């Protein structure tokens, strides 16, 4: 439960009672005078035509009439209590559960009863809703929620530490909210990389913190710098050159004209290495020279020839 209080003057005096006995037969001149306690003392009243002690006439708080608000979107009564304020009657201190004040009709009624209430606006406007794109945003940034216009007026008119605390609390609880990129910029690694290289105002170069972007911003972040340096873009270009960031990283988050960026020429292609020369196969050893064959004497042939000659000689001898 988130408690919020406001004070209002009660004008209704209809719910009255006597602080002590004040009717014939029930009082006397010796009846002690009563008191209204914390209730509204409307003054003295004569009792029993003056025969009894006069008594204060008191009025009770008209809780619903003084403090009543419309019910929440879920049909719950936001009123927690109604008590006489520390200043005394007829000032009434109305206490509400701010979590149950969740419609614009309730807010409008609250403002008509109590006037502007930054504390209510902080709780009401710093609630997550969806925009027409289906993204989670605060009511300040919503283009679909009926309270968008009212919350933007509060956002513009009530800069200060209390509002900053409400913005910061919303973005801590909703780190993925589309309108928290500026407040949550420290969680963006691209922001961290670029920020470490310079001290220029974030509104000058980080797109979510630019003055014309629909992002939640604290205090002086909403002021438009008059002397934004141009060197920051060269820093980013250098980071693109050395590969610290990519174009996809920075094109939507860094406020530079990237059409002026000229990427460095690609490095020359390395000369392919000369393939190694295949090794020369070893020369096979020279086979040994075969020995010269010697003539083989065929003894059988020689004996045959010799035999044939001998036979021929014998035949010729016989003829003779």
From Swiss-Prot:
User: Could you state one GO cellular component term attached to this entry?
Assistant: membrane
Bilayer-crossing residues are 301-318
**In what ranges is there compositional bias, type Pro residues?**
262-294
- Which membrane topology describes this protein? Single-pass membrane protein
Q: Which domain of life is it from?
A: Viruses
Query: Do you know which Pfam families this protein is assigned to?
Result: Pox_G9-A16
Write down the species.
Frog virus 3 (isolate Goorha)
What are the start and end residues of every segment in region (Disordered)? 261-294
Instruction: State the protein's name.
Output: Uncharacterized protein 002L
Give the subcellular location: Host membrane
Q: Which UniProt keywords apply?
A: Host membrane, Membrane, Transmembrane, Transmembrane helix
Q: What's the main place this protein lives?
A: host cell
Q: Which InterPro entries match?
A: Pox_virus_G9/A16
């Amino acid at each position: 439960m988130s408690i919020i209080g406001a004070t209002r003057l009660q004008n209704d005096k209809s719910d009255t009672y006597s602080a002590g006995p004040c009717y014939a037969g029930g009082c006397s001149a010796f009846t002690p005078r009563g008191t209204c306690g914390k209730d509204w003392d409307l003054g003295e009243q004569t009792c029993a035509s003056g025969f009894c002690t006069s008594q204060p006439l008191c009025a009770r708080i008209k809780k619903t009439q003084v403090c009543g608000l419309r019910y929440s979107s879920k049909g719950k009564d936001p009123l927690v209590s109604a008590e006489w304020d520390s200043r005394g009657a007829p000032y009434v201190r109305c206490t509400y559960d701010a979590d149950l004040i969740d419609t614009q009709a309730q807010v409008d009624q609250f403002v008509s009863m109590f006037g502007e209430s930054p504390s209510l606006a902080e709780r009401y406007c710093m609630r997550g809703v969806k925009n027409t794109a289906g993204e989670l945003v605060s009511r300040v940034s919503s283009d679909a929620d009926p309270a968008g216009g009212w919350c933007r007026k509060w956002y513009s008119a009530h800069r200060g530490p209390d509002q900053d605390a409400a913005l910061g609390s919303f973005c801590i609880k909703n780190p993925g909210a589309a309108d928290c990129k500026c407040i949550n910029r420290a969680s963006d690694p691209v922001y961290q990389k670029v920020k470490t290289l310079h001290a220029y105002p974030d509104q000058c170069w980080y797109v979510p913190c630019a003055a014309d972007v629909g992002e939640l911003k604290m205090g002086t972040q909403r002021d438009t710098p008059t002397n934004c340096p141009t060197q920051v873009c060269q820093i980013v270009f250098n980071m693109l050159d050395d590969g610290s960031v990519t174009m996809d990283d920075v094109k939507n988050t860094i406020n530079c004209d990237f059409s002026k960026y000229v990427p460095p020429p690609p490095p020359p292609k390395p000369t392919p290495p000369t393939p190694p020369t295949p090794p020369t196969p070893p020369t096979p050893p020279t086979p040994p020279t075969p020995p010269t064959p010697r003539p083989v004497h065929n003894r059988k042939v020689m004996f045959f020839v010799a035999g044939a000659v001998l036979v021929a000689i014998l035949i010729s001898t016989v003829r003779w």
